[in-house]
Amino acid sequence: MDDAGSSGGSGGFRPGVDSLDEPPNSRIFLVISKYTSESVLREHFSPFGDIQDIWVVRDKHTKESKGIAFVKFARSSQACRAMEEMHGQCLGPNDTKPIKVFIAQSRSSGSHRDVEDEELTRIFVMIPKSYTEEDLREKFKVYGDIEYCSVIKNKVTGESKGLGYVRYLKPSQAAQAIENCDRSFRALLAEPKNKVLESPEQDYYSSVRQETLGHEPRGNLFPFVGEQQSEFSTFDKNDSRGQEAISKRLSVASRVPFTEEQLFSIFDIVPGLEYCEVHRDPYLNYGHGVVQYFNVASAVYAQYKLHGFQYPPGNRIAVSFLDDGSNSADLIRKMATQMVAAQLASTVWSNPSHQQFLQFGGSAGSQVPQIQTDVVLPSCRKKAPPETPVKERLFIVFNPHPLPLDVLEDIFCRFGNLIEVYLVSGKNVGYVKYADRMSANDAITTLHGKILNGVRLKVMLADSPREVSKKRQRTY
């Protein structure tokens, strides 16, 4: 680009260096004849939209054209349509060599290859949880031919996460959808699947920071941050957020782009991370993402601790709540219950006398334990007599701490034929004895990997003591 010269007319708007990629994907790269002039390019490409400038790359010394040019449009959809219709065309009777047209790579991307069509056809949208794939298709089919739609769902419950993808057949159709759809969808260009950075991370960040750190984002185009915080004006931990509705879902915004792996590594510091997504906004060269936790307590803690966190050093990220349609009062009640349950479990576990108190009597024993979970549990069933032969033994691992014994008995008795639940003193593990193998298998299927009262359980078959005792003893 250093030796790109332009003889652009004085009547057109010439964007500055900082505006070359605003909006992103609005600049096309041309491979043309060395004899093709700017006026010919303007004649053939102006029907596609508002041309802001044309650059014909020339030799520094001879000033001859190198057969390469750039055309900057005002909108991404204009550039995409020009690429689709002009690639492989000839520009005149005296210019019989077909030209090549590509969407130019962003100057801040750190990559020297041109953008592929596949990267420009898939958009990411936020939708009501009631939306089906047909509803999504119906809303977005007006912008072009749709290859497929998908609604992201919870793998366990099958419930929509309020997120979806729409894939078009042409890049211009995806760009039209992003530019013209209702802003409530917060449509963004989705990250390519299995995208791999082509340059070392350090080089990538250094090049991006030179391009973006000195520029303030335009607040009205920053969809992931609340209107009060759109310009990263403050990162005070004591900001008043009384009007901000809490949820399990967070939006993350950064002046520096980030990958999904980097986003995960930051927010996985707080236990309970469910998933994270990275999105690309074609109008901004900034990092945008969505993070969701299994419980609201983790989300609240992550928002407080990570809002204003510097990653990479010198770049502060903005973290705010995203409305996921949940009832805030109900979420606060669940969070309070989880916190009390965790505090109670910690107190009981650190004091054996309290553990015995809860197990064998006391005022707490007369109350039915309250269980907070998304897991659908069967109703309570009677325990088997203590002298019943053990048919199956389960091993449980708790993270971050064990649940109280009364809660565990309430959970595991629901599968029937429960004999006993006991915890290993000083460890985050325990055992469950069943009088029937089917009941034990049902418990594993229902509870393994699930979160109850803020604690994740690993439930698996334990090694049988009888099998261990039958092993031949070593004689050496």
Swiss-Prot record:
Entry's InterPro entries?
Nucleotide-bd_a/b_plait_sf, RBD_domain_sf, RBM45_RRM1, RBM45_RRM2, RBM45_RRM3, RBM45_RRM4, RRM_dom, SLIRP/GR-RBP-like
Mention any one GO cellular component term assigned to this protein in its UniProt record.
Answer: ribonucleoprotein complex
Phosphoserine modification sites are 199, 464
The region called Disordered is annotated at 1-20
Listed A to Z, the keywords are: Cytoplasm, Developmental protein, Differentiation, Isopeptide bond, Neurogenesis, Nucleus, Phosphoprotein, Repeat, RNA-binding, Ubl conjugation
Key word Cytoplasm present? yes
Q: What does this protein do?
A: RNA-binding protein with binding specificity for poly(C). May play an important role in neural development.
PANTHER family per the record?
A: HETEROGENEOUS NUCLEAR RIBONUCLEOPROTEIN 87F-RELATED
Q: What is this protein called?
A: RNA-binding protein 45
Q: Which organism is it from?
A: Rattus norvegicus (Rat)
Q: What is the gene name?
A: Rbm45
